[in-house]
Amino acid sequence: MFTRLITTSALTGAIALTIGSQAFAQTELAWWHGMTGANNEMVNELSKEFNESQSEYKIVPVYKGNYPETLNAGIAAFRSKQPPAILQVFDAGSGVMMAAEGAIVPAAEVLEKGGYKFDKSQYLPGIVAYYSKPDGTMLSFPYNSSSPILYYNKDAFKKAGLDENKPPKTWPEVFEAAKKIKASGASPCGFTSTWLTWIQTENFAAWNNVPYGTNENGLAGTDVKLEINSPLYVEHFQAIADLAKDGTFRYGGRTSEAKQLFTSGECAMLTESSGGLGDVVKSGINYGIGQLPYYEGHGPQNTIPGGASLWVFAGLSDDQYKGIAEFFNFLSQSKIQVKLHEKSGYLPVTLAAYEETKKSDFYEKNPGRETPILQMMGKEPTENSKGVRLVNLPQVRDILNEEFEAMLGGKQDAKTALDNAVKRGNAAIAAAQ
């Protein structure tokens, strides 16, 4: 939570501003984002609520495409000296933004410009640490943090003779359930997944406590060598490739496209961000939630944050920075965090909002909704599960996706795909140093 710092001069200025408020034009703050569907509706709702809560600043949300497209649009806008006030950057883009010293103003500094002091002890530690420098300085505001979970179609489970109240816990159990669902005709497809990079490699590493790369996956140093071709990865992706041969596993796309395969009833199981919940609920499907599957003897350890955070560029006016600070403070309020969490499935970033949600019996009334939080906070992180930080993670993800697509298309096996991904990824990381 943020504590307001009030000085005599600030109070005098506030009184003067109130008296002469009509003489000042409203400061508009463009918020570029990559949210669609129910999450886009939430962006618009929160912007409207903030705008109606005061008259000095106006948040103007602008959809700029999917997460990678939004990041690229923001970088291009900064280079042309026309950046938005606020840019939503997905987790993979954090390393890119952190490396752009001089191009961004840390969120903690923005808050200070607005008269607020950031108290990181009031936030979920894993989330704040992910978006902070080693010295603890918060670089971006964690707007929509998420954790990957398993969604499953209860009706399809019942038709296939599976227990609709007992989601599979391990990957072998998921694969067996997928085969039964496909063979029984309960659904045309047993299993799909969004974000093969974030969920099936980065979180796979953390949740199963195996290294993604050297140097603590990049958190202990930028000279990283990928290790995603070790035996457990090969076993996992070969199982997925085998299921893809007859359509038991169906590939939807590189980001969140596969969610449509689940909400349409095409596929009976989906690994997806907890932030995808809004669209799942909106679809009306009879769904259940389970924890992210793991391999016995390896997991479960802890998941790492996904979603996105809000970054602020350098070169804005003092009025803009003050307005952004007010907006960040607004977003940190418990009532706002509770609303965002309950409606969207994203995690409440403050401990106060989490406690308030628990006290309301929300989790008892909505089984599975606490799962993504417990996954992230359940165990102390290891060297393998603190996160992944590469200066060019979006580029490395593209390389992995190309190899996965060739594998799923039957052009190569999992070991070849992962060996190629490591070789190409390491070359790209070295070139970006």
Curated annotation (Swiss-Prot):
The complex is composed of two ATP-binding proteins (UgpC), two transmembrane proteins (UgpA and UgpE) and a solute-binding protein (UgpB). Belongs to the bacterial solute-binding protein 1 family. Part of the ABC transporter complex UgpBAEC involved in sn-glycerol-3-phosphate (G3P) import. Binds G3P. One of its GO terms (cellular component) is periplasmic space. InterPro entries: Bact_solute-bd_prot1 (IPR050490), SBP (IPR006059). This is sn-glycerol-3-phosphate-binding periplasmic protein UgpB. PANTHER family: ARABINOSE-BINDING PROTEIN-RELATED, SN-GLYCEROL-3-PHOSPHATE-BINDING PERIPLASMIC PROTEIN UGPB. Pfam families: SBP_bac_8. It is found in: Periplasm. Sn-glycerol 3-phosphate binds at residues 67, 91, 146, 273, 307, 346, 397. Residues 1-25 form the signal peptide. Its main location: periplasm. Keywords: Periplasm, Signal, Transport. Coiled coil: none annotated.
